[in-house]
């Protein structure tokens, strides 16, 4: 009887097995063996001794039984080093050891005896054998084993020819399957429940990566169906004890999915958020993380939670662990072939993957990235050790798909190790075919690999450390939705394909795969690279496919295998491929589908995008399939979603099919059904005039107005989408159409704007144009004429008079406009009168003034120059104090311009170009109050006269200033300004909001409030200004007297050319500071240089800082005048406190003065101690000079 025992650490079981086997050999031997094992320290030693005694007893030596103990003691060393060979017993006490099979291996010795130390391996064995020293010897691939004989370790290699059925070139099969691949339900229709769009998720603090990843996972049909099927586990989950109070991550995912499906408002995924440290230890709550990193840790945590359901999950091999539901859904196998360039030896290995990381640095499309990933690459020279050559050689390596996953996860490598982001646009399609990348095996070559985009994760930002994550998911209705934290909105197919995707999830398209698999006349259940379609979930798929194959007819006897977009059943393309003549009428009572809208141009069918959108990708927002309908309709619906192939599909057939599909999916009655069946063959090609929900806001209104620059406000409460980096092609087309309308409005057709496609259209009614393109309301009129009537006339109208007459004419025009704006009446022509009245009446009551710009502002979307006949509408700026309208002023208001000479005057043209962009402010108050030009808020006119010898100096705001006497001081104290300190002026302006004219710190007006150029010239000629360009402060009487200026006054002959030359120089200086002349809308002003606008003689003077300094240093009674220096920094004395006494030795006072001079030359200020010692000396020196 062969020895049969179970390997165990305890010696009792071993001794019992030995006694049972050696029962017939002699009781003394058994007793001796038991005694020896009782005194032995280890079970293995007693086993070896008992086996040796048993062998001697079988030989028949009579002294062996009597002297068994003495022989064991004498040969203790040989017994300890001896090895016993065993082999597995298949049916040994199966009823007894049934519960112990997972812990014990049943073995038996070899008949050749213990003398032969080499043993043969069994192909069905587990590859483990127990040696005499208690260690396991693991068999290799070819059956190599390590045997120990007489203390020497000897390696013997022997190949097994009996059961060697494993092929190294084929994927090994796991010994145990934890979750069958056939149980995975693909597609939303495979589930018994109704799937909603899903609620949004609240951002609880930098959790956009978590929300977007969960939304993308929840919109994968295979994963969602599996999570819903885990209800029994969720109810009886006992993993919470081992995982702590957090519980199972699979249960948390299932509960979160149920919450998003049942709630209508945004939910808070606290079940996942609280397990963040359980998912990944280094992730911190509230910190920004990478979405792909979180995805990998989340899937790994779910796999670990599933393996914990099995008691011996730690002892499972890697192949068994790769049969979990998560691995069956996301997992696949890559075949790596390394070919030696010397001996052409090919080494094949298999690699399990759950996502593909594609390099996009050299790719512009997703197909190019796939080609680069699966292309043959050359390993570095002499860097691969070939198994055939046994040396390092050059080789090539290539990947291929051995087993394609059910859900393909693709990550685009957009981030570098330094955190920088590659923001290039990668174009992709909602359907991809990976058949050309499959391994060339008989099972994989005949089956297509068609995938459909189900969800994706996008990243908005410029680097890995900042930005925002959003998700896009495909719902059961076939529409894509954008999930931006708590905001959920539908998104068009064009926007989806133009998104800078980061992570994409593609799922196997069962419908198209079943169509192609049925074309091979196989009546069995189709398989997809080892994936068997679920017959129990969709039994009508195979039946419909077989019936379609039986009734199909082809032009050729043997049609080649066709990979790519297919037409629905009953329609053939121009190549003769008939996918099925069976007529299937899909009638959805509450889920009408939408076909992609085709644009007709000259009888040709043109796609609105690079590819035609699938029929199933356009579904209704609220429609759904009733569960009472047959599965045949559902399968036929899945079959009918095919793209149009522009190389082999007839355009007219496509359009007819599109209309036919639309008629059958809309709700119809029985009479209408009969009529549709009679008119199947002759369906008129017409546009889709009834777009269904979901709808997006329309870009333009279906109105017949000409050159309308207003964008309608949509009635749908949906907010605008997150702006992506590239606009879609449809948006570019609409922008081009808008540009054409602006350039040539007289050639506009009756209906210039086409309605967008179904998911991009809106059902809102036409509204009057009341919203400008910049988002602000119009204030100058309700119609198109009012929007363009206030704009400037063509700049080609030249000045017809000489320079002197033009100056006075401009002054008269300024006075006429000022009077007309205030009183509501004007003395100009009727057109100008109507324009001025519209500007006054359309203004709201809270607006105090209107900005009038000569150059005008173009609209935000204006890319082409406007037509001279139809200038663009003026820009409108909305502020707290009202609505500001930027319009243009007319310089030729009088009728005298039309009767003037037609010759162009060069000086007048130059002058016109110089102040063409002048900006003036016109008050619209009922009464006119002449104010001080330097300080309009002053109650009394300023009495300060202009200094005759002052030079003109241009500041940042472009205003002129009067020169002042240079002062010497400590840098902290200053006299008050002529019109009061800076704080009092600021207090007077506290009621004014953003967008209004704001005075400078010194009380002077900004560029938007300064006087017009013609008034300045008129004042200079009238004698109220200096000839060198400086302008004094004029009082109210001076301004009133300037109205009665006689044009025939005595003026020097060189006055006009001098003024024009100065005006040209001044306008050139003003043009360089256009950035500083812009209106303050609440943004921070940009200062080009370090100098600040001031009223003092030093460029770095700041009156507001001076006022603050007076409160701190008012105790200084030195009586010195303040003096500020450029680049003065606050608290500079703290840094340079001991700078004056850093020089030692003789001549300390001279060194101190030299250091002070260098300090002042560098732009620093006085320190406190230097001020006390040197203030009076500098004052005296300057007074003497």
UniProtKB/Swiss-Prot annotation:
Biased composition (Low complexity): 642-658, 778-797, 836-853, 1151-1161, 1172-1185
Residue stretches of biased makeup (Acidic residues): 670-683, 891-920
ATP-binding listed as a keyword: no
Bias (Basic and acidic residues): 1062-1071
Positions with biased composition (Polar residues): 126-169, 924-942, 959-975
Domain USP: 199-509
Cellular location(s): Nucleus, Nucleolus
Gene Ontology molecular function terms on file: cysteine-type deubiquitinase activity; K63-linked deubiquitinase activity
EC number from the UniProt entry: 3.4.19.12
GO cellular component terms, semicolon-separated: cytosol; nucleolus
InterPro entries: Papain-like_cys_pep_sf, Peptidase_C19, Peptidase_C19_UCH, USP_CS, USP_dom
Annotated protein name in UniProt: Ubiquitin carboxyl-terminal hydrolase 36
């Amino acid at each position: 009887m062969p020895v049969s025992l179970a390997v165990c650490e305890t010696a009792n079981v071993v001794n019992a097995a030995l006694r049972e086997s050696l029962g017939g050999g002699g009781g003394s031997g058994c007793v001796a063996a038991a005694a020896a094992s009782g005194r032995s320290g280890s079970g293995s030693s007693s086993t070896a001794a008992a086996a040796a005694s048993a062998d001697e007893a079988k030989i028949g030596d009579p002294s062996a039984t009597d002297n068994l103990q003495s022989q064991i003691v004498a040969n203790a060393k040989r017994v300890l080093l001896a090895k016993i060979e065993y082999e597995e017993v298949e049916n040994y006490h199966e009823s007894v050891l049934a519960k112990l099979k997972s812990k014990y291996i049943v073995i038996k010795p070899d008949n050749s005896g213990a003398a032969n130390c080499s043993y043969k391996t069994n192909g069905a064995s587990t590859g483990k054998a127990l040696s005499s020293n208690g260690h396991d010897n693991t068999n290799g691939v070819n059956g190599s084993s390590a045997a120990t004989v007489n203390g020497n370790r000897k390696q013997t290699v022997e190949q097994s020819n009996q059961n060697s059925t494993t092929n190294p070139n084929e994927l090994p099969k796991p010994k145990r399957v934890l979750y069958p691949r056939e149980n995975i339900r693909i597609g939303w229709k495979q589930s018994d429940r109704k799937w909603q769009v899903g609620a949004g998720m609240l951002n609880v603090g930098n959790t956009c990566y978590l929300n977007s990843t969960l939304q993308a996972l929840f919109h994968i049909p295979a994963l969602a169906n599996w999570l819903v099927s885990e209800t029994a586990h969720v109810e009886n989950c006992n993993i919470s004890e081992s995982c702590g109070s957090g519980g199972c991550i699979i249960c948390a995912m299932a509960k979160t999915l149920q919450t998003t499906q049942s709630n209508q408002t945004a939910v808070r995924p606290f079940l996942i958020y609280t397990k963040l440290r359980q998912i990944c230890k280094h992730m911190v709550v509230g910190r920004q993380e990478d979405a792909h990193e979180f995805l990998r840790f989340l899937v790994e945590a779910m796999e670990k939670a599933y393996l914990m359901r099995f008691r011996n999950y730690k002892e499972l091999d890697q192949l068994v662990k790769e049969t979990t539901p998560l691995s069956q859904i996301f997992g696949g196998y890559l075949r790596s072939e390394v070919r030696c360039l010397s001996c052409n030896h090919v080494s094949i290995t298999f690699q399990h993957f759950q996502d593909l990381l594609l390099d996009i640095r050299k790719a512009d499309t997703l197909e190019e990235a796939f080609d680069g990933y699966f292309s043959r690459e050359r390993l570095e020279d002499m860097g691969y050790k070939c198994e055939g050559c046994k040396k390092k050689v050059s080789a090539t390596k290539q990947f291929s798909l051995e087993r394609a996953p059910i859900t393909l996860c693709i990550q685009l490598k957009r981030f570098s190790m330094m955190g920088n982001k590659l923001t290039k646009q990668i174009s992709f399609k909602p359907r991809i075919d990976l058949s050309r990348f499959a391994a060339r095996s008989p099972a994989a070559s005949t089956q297509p690999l068609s995938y459909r985009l189900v969800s994706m994760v996008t990243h908005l930002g410029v680097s890995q450390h900042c930005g925002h994550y959003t998700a896009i998911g495909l719902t059961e209705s076939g529409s894509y939705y954008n999930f931006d934290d708590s905001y959920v909105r539908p998104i068009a197919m064009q926007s989806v394909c133009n998104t800078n995707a980061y992570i994409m999830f593609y799922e196997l398209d069962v419908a198209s795969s079943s169509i192609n698999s049925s074309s091979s006349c196989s009546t069995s259940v189709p398989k997809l690279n080892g994936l068997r379609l679920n017959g129990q979930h969709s039994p009508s798929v195979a039946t419909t496919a077989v019936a379609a194959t039986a009734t199909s007819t082809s032009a050729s006897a043997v049609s080649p295998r066709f990979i790519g977009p297919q037409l629905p059943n009953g329609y053939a393309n121009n190549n003769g491929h008939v996918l099925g003549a069976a007529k299937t009428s899909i009638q959805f009572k509450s889920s009408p589908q939408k076909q992609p809208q085709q644009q007709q141009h000259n009888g040709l069918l043109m796609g609105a995008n690079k590819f035609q959108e699938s029929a199933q990708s356009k579904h209704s927002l609220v429609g759904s399939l009733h569960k009472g309908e047959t599965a045949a309709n559902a399968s036929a619906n899945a079959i009918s979603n095919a793209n149009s192939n522009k190389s082999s599909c007839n355009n007219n057939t496509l359009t007819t099919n599109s209309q036919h599909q639309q008629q059958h999916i809309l709700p119809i009655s029985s009479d209408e059904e009969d009529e549709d069946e009679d008119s199947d063959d002759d369906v008129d090609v017409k546009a889709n005039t009834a777009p269904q929900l979901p709808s997006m806001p329309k870009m333009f209104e279906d109105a017949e107005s000409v050159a309308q620059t207003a964008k309608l406000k949509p009635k749908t409460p949906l907010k605008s989408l997150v702006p992506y980096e590239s606009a879609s092609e449809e948006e570019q087309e609409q922008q081009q159409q808008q540009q054409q309308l602006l350039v040539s409005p007289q050639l506009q057709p009756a209906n210039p704007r086409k309605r967008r496609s179904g998911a991009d259209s809106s059902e809102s009614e036409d509204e009057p144009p009341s919203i400008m393109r910049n988002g602000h309301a119009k204030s100058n009129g309700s119609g198109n004429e009012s929007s363009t009537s206030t704009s400037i006339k063509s700049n080609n109208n030249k000045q017809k008079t000489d320079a002197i007459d033009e100056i006075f004419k401009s002054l008269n025009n300024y006075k006429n406009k000022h009077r007309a704006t205030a009183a509501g009446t004007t003395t100009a022509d009727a057109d100008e009168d109507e324009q001025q009245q519209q500007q006054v009446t359309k203004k709201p009551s809270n607006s105090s003034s209107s900005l009038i710009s000569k150059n005008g502002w173009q609209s935000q979307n204006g890319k082409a120059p406007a037509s001279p006949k139809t200038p663009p509408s003026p820009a409108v700026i909305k502020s707290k104090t009202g609505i500001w309208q930027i319009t243009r002023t007319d310089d030729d208001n009088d009728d005298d311009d039309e009767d003037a000479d037609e010759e162009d005057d060069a000086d007048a043209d130059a002058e016109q170009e110089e102040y063409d962009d002048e900006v003036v402010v016109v008050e619209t108050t009922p009464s006119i109050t002449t104010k001080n030009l330097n300080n309009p808020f002053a109650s009394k006119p300023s009495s300060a006269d202009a200094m005759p010898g002052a030079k003109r100096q241009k500041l940042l705001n472009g205003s002129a200033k009067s020169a002042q006497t240079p002062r010497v001081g400590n840098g902290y104290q200053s006299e008050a300004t002529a019109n009061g300190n800076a704080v009092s002026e600021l207090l007077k302006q506290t009621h004014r909001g953003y967008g209004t004219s704001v005075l400078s710190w010194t009380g002077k007006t900004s560029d938007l409030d300064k006087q017009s150029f013609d008034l300045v010239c008129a004042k200079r000629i009238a004698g109220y200004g200096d000839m060198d360009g400086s302008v004094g402060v004029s009082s109210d009487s001076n301004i009133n007297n300037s109205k009665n200026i006689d044009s025939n006054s005595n003026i020097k002959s060189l006055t006009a050319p001098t003024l024009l030359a100065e005006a040209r120089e001044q306008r050139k200086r003003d043009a360089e500071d256009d950035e500083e002349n812009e209106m303050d809308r609440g943004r921070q002003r940009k200062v080009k240089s370090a100098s600040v606008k001031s009223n003092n003689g030093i460029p770095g003077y700041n009156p507001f800082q001076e006022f603050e300094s007076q409160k701190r240093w008012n105790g200084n009674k030195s009586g010195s005048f303040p003096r500020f220096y450029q680049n003065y920094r606050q608290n500079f004395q703290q840094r340079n406190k001991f700078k004056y006494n850093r020089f030692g030795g003789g001549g300390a006072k001279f060194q101190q003065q030299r250091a002070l001079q260098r300090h002042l030359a560098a732009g620093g200020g006085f320190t406190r101690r230097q001020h006390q010692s040197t203030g009076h000396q500098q004052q005296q020196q300057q007074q003497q000079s």
